Amino acid sequence: MKVNDRVTVKTDGGPRRPGVVLAVEEFSEGTMYLVSLEDYPLGIWFFNEAGHQDGIFVEKAE
């Protein structure tokens, strides 16, 4: 995924929430995405852990 992509994010105890990627940072353990959400318009960071399906919080919107 890249900046300006529309995504959904997994949050605790609720449905996936729509957002837009503001920044991307790659790490050896996975990728951090700064995502703008309705109640966090300046963005909040989410981490997608490489190699662990349970550690995927950001997915590209369909």
From Swiss-Prot:
Induction: Expression is dependent on RpoS. It comes from the Bacteria. It holds the Pfam family DSRB. NCBIfam families: PRK10708.1 (NF007981). Belongs to the DsrB family. This is Protein DsrB.
